[in-house]
Swiss-Prot record:
Membrane topology: Multi-pass membrane protein
Residue positions with a glycan: N180
Post-translational modification: Glycosylated.
Keyword match tRNA processing: no
CDD domains to which the protein is assigned, alphabetical: NET-5_like_LEL
TM annotation in the entry: 14-34, 56-76, 86-106, 204-224
Tissue-wise expression: Expressed in megakaryocytes and platelets (at protein level).
Record protein name field: Tetraspanin-9
Organism in which the protein naturally occurs: Homo sapiens (Human)
GO cellular component, one term: tetraspanin-enriched microdomain
Length: 239
């Protein structure tokens, strides 16, 4: 009976991690596609030039894919080393997530202040050479989120000149509309808009975060259960 339950657990863990691995492959593929097809779409931050959407997706996809591979192989081969490695990787990821979450809430005001400062410094690079990605990023987010600047539209004045904003700040976008002082503009800053989006979707984001946490804990529990069984018996059990 116990052997049958453990066999079931073994294949459940394999299937669970196979799905995990496939998701990682999908994310990696999307990240590479973004990097190739949207090469000019970069980060908003001059302090972290490599922190683009494509690079983030590639990094997350790689971590998920490697973790899923360790879990799949460790479960199907009943390999103690791989199962332990899988457990440690999940534990490190879980601890890192908790530490980052705690630090974020403890230093939230400082994070907001530094983020706004860094984004405003990035605006100064809007029309400079070799920063087409940053320009495209600002144009897209301002058009999609109906916002202008970091805190408000006046953030653009030191960059583009008095009473001048990018055309994407106009409520009705047209060539040169940002130079017309009478043109209706999106008044809300993009930083505030992003915060509003997170606030509006906090329940969905919280649910997703809880699901990820449960999956990590289940993965750790499954791997340690198999590890302990193999360690006690000192041999593989028949599938």
């Amino acid at each position: 009976m116990a052997r049958g339950c453990l066999c079931c657990l073994k294949y459940m863990m394999f299937l669970f991690n196979l799905i995990f691995w496939l998701c990682g492959c999908g994310l990696l593929g999307v990240g590479i596609w973004l990097s190739v097809s949207q090469g000019n779409f970069a980060t908003f931050s001059p302090s972290f030039p490599s922190l683009s959407a494509a690079n983030l997706v590639i990094a997350i996809g790689t971590i998920v894919m490697v973790t899923g591979f360790l879990g799949c192989l460790g479960a199907i081969k009943e390999n103690k080393c791989l199962l332990l490695s899988f457990f440690i990787v999940l534990l490190v990821i879980l601890l890192a997530e908790l530490i980052l979450l705690i630090l974020f809430f403890v230093y939230m005001d400082k994070v907001n202040e530094n983020a706004k400062k860094d984004l405003k410094e990035g605006l100064l690079l809007y029309h400079t050479e070799n920063n087409v990605g940053l320009k495209n990023a600002w144009n897209i987010i301002q058009a999609e989120m109906r916002c202008c600047g970091v805190t408000d539209y006046t953030d653009w004045y030191p960059v583009l000149g008095e009473n001048t904003v990018p055309d994407r700040c106009c409520m009705e976008n047209s060539q040169g509309c940002g130079r017309n002082a009478t043109t209706p503009l999106w008044r809300t800053g993009c930083y505030e808009k992003v915060k509003m989006w997170f606030d509006d979707n906090k329940h969905v984001l919280g649910t997703v975060g809880m699901c990820i946490l449960i999956m990590q804990i289940l993965g750790m529990a499954f791997s340690m259960t198999l590890f302990q069984h193999i360690h006690r018996t000192g041999k593989k059990y028949d599938a």
